[in-house]
Amino acid sequence: MALLVLGAGTAWASHRPNNEVLLGGAISQTGQYAEPAGRQVNSIKLWIDEVNGRGGLLGHKVVVRLLDDKSDTQTAIKLYEKLITEDKVDLLLAPYSSGITEAVANVNERYKMPFVAYGAASSPIWEKGRKYIFNIVAVAEDYQKGAVHLAKQIGVQKIAIIGQDSLFPRQAGKGAKDWAKKLGIDVVLEENYPPKQTDFTALLQKIKAAGAEAVISNSYFADAAAQLRQMRELNVNFTLYSSTVGPGLPNFPEQLGNTAEYVLGFSQWEPLP
């Protein structure tokens, strides 16, 4: 972060009290991304407390302005325009999700405002020659690598790959399919569903009918939770079930209880903030 500050210029807004550094971002506080994005907000607040406790960022107190993009791409675009042109933030904080980050990256690129993308993992974001966005997390295509390898180790021969029809889940699914092919596992079903889908009964029955022994679900908190609850209701069981985002969050086992047992998930770091 200090390197980004130095690259952003030496003169922060002189009208701010005591030469404060203003950070700003639009991060989902409501909508489908609120749960994982909330962990991102926690980490930002933790970092600010630690930095200010050490005397600030390069000697300047850090203050933050966090807005709610409501898990909506168009809202995020408008809010980042506002943060840059009206609020005149010194540094930008990245949004959550690959889809929103992909759209917002066009805004910060236009204004030459750098940010580190710590809540987006899809490779296409970094394949367009952009100069002002940086990645620090594993790429989406490798999220299910461990799950597919484990499936191979325990003798699974047929898997289903499902996921929300948005950028990150599609890329995670692409990676899972590639890993399955390398390991000689048969993908008997591939299907993406609308982002707000809540009823997975027909899809789960379709997966079972296809003969899948394991489910690679490229999902977020809400859809993964719904799939697991409905699996239990239908008494549909698989040798392995892996989800990209939901199981790695503390609220997942808290909300699902025993239904979350034996479910695989992914985490970028431990413990979660």
Regions found by a protein language model. Name each.
Residues M1-G7:
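Bacterial N-terminal signal peptides
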Residues S14-L22, E35-N42, R54-P124, I136, ...:
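Beta-alpha junction/loop-to-helix N-cap segments that form part of ligand/metal-binding clefts
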Residues L22-A26, V63-L66, D90-P95, M113-G119, ...:
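Structural recognition of the beta-strand scaffold that forms the well-ordered cores
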Residues Q32-N42, L167-A172:
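Glycine- and acidic-residue-enriched helix-capping/strand-helix junction motifs
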Residues V51-L58, R110-M113, A180-D186, R232-N237, ...:
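Short helix-capping segments at alpha-helix termini
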Residues K78, S123-P124, K131-N235, P273:
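Extracellular/periplasmic Venus flytrap/periplasmic-binding protein
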Residues L228-P273:
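Extracellular/periplasmic periplasmic-binding protein-like sensory domains
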